[in-house]
Amino acid sequence: MQPAQSARSIARVALAIDPTPESLSAARYVRTLLRPGMQLRIVCAIDNPRLVLPDIPRIDALLTSAREEMTHDAQATIERTVALFAGSDVAIEHAIVDTSITGGSVADALANDTSQWGADVLVVGANPHHGLLRLVEGAMSDTLATRAHCALLLVPASYARESDGPLQRLMFAVDGSEPSLHAVEVGLGFAAPQTLLYAAYVVDRAVRLTDIVPVRALENAYRAEGEDALARVAPMLHATGNPTRRGIVETRPTSDDVAHALMRDAVHWHAELLVVGTHGRRGIAAWLIGSVARRVAHLAEVPVLLVRGQGR
């Protein structure tokens, strides 16, 4: 059986790291995704010490010392990370990006480096409290999601795959829109021949005071739209030759939303990667409006691949 094919194959993976355990977990996860022929760029961006130290006279020596220490720590972090990929049969390169030279924030530096290298996906380890999650907070998320010009893969700090090797369960959130279908194309680049592919559409059943259309009528309309969305994605999944399944997921009638329902289903199904397009319609779009990566990072219990719409 031939490997699953994708209109947008994954060939170049950028991994953003820092000294935190979250980055180490993300690196271990990436190791299981790589296949021979892929290229990996490990990037450690360091802050400009002038931004975190008071601007007082005669501080140049202190700034130089701080910068040297940051560079030393970054190099040690890169060496530990590179060691994880020994024997992986992929081309590996690494770089330290110094924002005191490039200017801008760490997110700016990562976005620029990732774009210049031509990455297909940028991987970031995420923790709700510290580490690189700050990159997906507020305006930072806009920088990575728009300027990097590639998919963004967030790996929760608490997530650990039960086994190494190719993905066994790959889940797609679909809504029938072109960005949603494009996300499926990109996500299929991580599928191996044995990967089970699951496309899910979420029907929002949550009652809101602003609803003026009868709830049952809305549910029926959303369900019909869901069936259509799943029918549109079916040929793409079947063309891979992989085992596939499709399903409609429903939110709870009250105190629930699409994001939580989707993540619950991903966890229940034991998804090893959830793929989401960032410019879809209705429920999915509502989830991803605003601080895209921040919202996902705080909810995610499984790795999430955020895929920008074509031409965005």
Predicted segments — roles?
Residues 1-8, 82-122, 238-274, 311-312:
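Structural beta-alpha unit
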Residues 2-65, 90, 166-216, 220-223, ...:
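Small/aliphatic-rich secondary-structure junction motif
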Residues 10, 105-106, 121-143, 161, ...:
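Glycine-rich, Arg-bearing micro-motifs that act as flexible, cationic patches
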Residues 35-116, 120:
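Ordered, small/hydrophobic-rich secondary-structure cores
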